[in-house]
Amino acid sequence: MSTEPVAILGTGMTDMSRRDQSAETMAHQAVHEALGDAGVEPHELSLVVAANALGGRLCEQGCIRGQTWLRKAGLGDVAVVNVDNSCAGGTSAAHVGSLVARASAGPVLVLGVEKMWTGDRAATLAGIEDGLPADYRADMHARFRPEENPGGSILMGLNDFWARQCMNDRGTTVEQIAAAAVKARYNASRNPMAQITKATTIDEVLASPQVAGVLTRLMCSSFTDGAAALVLGPADRAPAGGAFIVGSVARSGNGEMDYHDRLGETARAAWETFGCGPGDFDMVELHDATSAEEIYALESLGLFGHGEAGPATLAGDTAIGGRGLTVNPSGGLVGRGHPLGATGIAQIVELATHLRGRGGTRQVEGARLGLAVNTGGVIEGDAAYVGIHAVAAGR
């Protein structure tokens, strides 16, 4: 856990609608953009923390991925530490990077990069399933029978189970889930770095092909290539009008708690650590692997009351310029995209973009405090990792 502010000196991110770039090319682009934004020279860096999930399976690089993909980036001999934490690799890297930046003499570079489009869909799905314990996968296959679902994914089967749980326990409707997808894709259509470039309607979401159970294709995140980077440093190096990571809390599940209960437990620890509550935030970037999960997570985190997130979404309250908390102004995983190891960093980049007044047509006006929530992996129904960052505007 951390509470001392860490300055976000610079940010960088690739266009997540592209599929034609290598992991190395994307890493270089995000890194040099972040360094340029920060005005930091490579020789000033004290550490690089690099996150990736699927490089072993999809890029034939089982180890030393950060060193391999950055060896021609001109960073010299700065130490590179690699992080692999499934969908939460970038969030984990930011957590580690913020801890180091607080104590280090030089800035810390945090990078997340993922290459998911390789032409081998089965290999990508298998890599995603590595986010489950090996001795748990057979049980998951037997339970969710991916061969019987159009999407062919046990994790989308699990997400359908959660969607139905949210509908049965909280009164969420399929129209409310579709409304979350519409919001995500509209926000993404105004985000020049997003995977999705076209807005949609509730009817189009509901009519799109089935993935698993109640979930349709337009309600779900999809494979994404992308990279995102942060340059972090001590608060006294922050430029005027900058943004700061003012809190970071992380928890790992061990199979003893329900996934959404783990979200709630981690959120309560975050509020205590941050010294603020769920009502203090202007915007949140969260892990919407599906649009149903957006609604379920909002309530599990305590950002909305039981059964309230779905109606608020349908009413437009969570939209940019809506009456309430702005949810996933980037478009989230469903709209911006979900390049696993880069997702958590992309969330923080998005919050910093708004806090620095750089959001363009999707700017969350007057935002002063944002929340980034990301998860990775599933341990017997529990979240393997939950990471929460609070990001604030400078004074």
Identify the meaning behind each predicted range:
Residues 12-15, 51-56, 85-89, 112-119, ...:
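Acidic, glycine-rich active-site loops and adjacent beta-strand->loop/helix elements
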Residues 1-24, 138, 149, 168, ...:
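Condensing-enzyme catalytic core mediating Claisen C-C bond formation in acyl metabolism
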Residues 42-52, 79-85, 107-112, 176-182, ...:
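Beta-strand segments within the central parallel beta-sheet cores of soluble alpha/beta enzyme folds
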Residues 2-4, 18, 55-107, 115, ...:
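Conserved catalytic cysteine-centered active-site region
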Residues 269-292, 300-303, 333-339:
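Extended C-terminal subregions enriched in glycine
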Residues 1-88, 96, 162-174, 195-201, ...:
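Conserved active-site "lid/cap" helical segment
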Residues 84-114, 156-190, 230-236, 336-359:
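Active-site-proximal alpha-helical scaffold in enzymes
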Residues 56-64, 256-260, 288-311, 339-341, ...:
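Short glycine/threonine-rich loop-to-helix capping motif typified by GTGT followed
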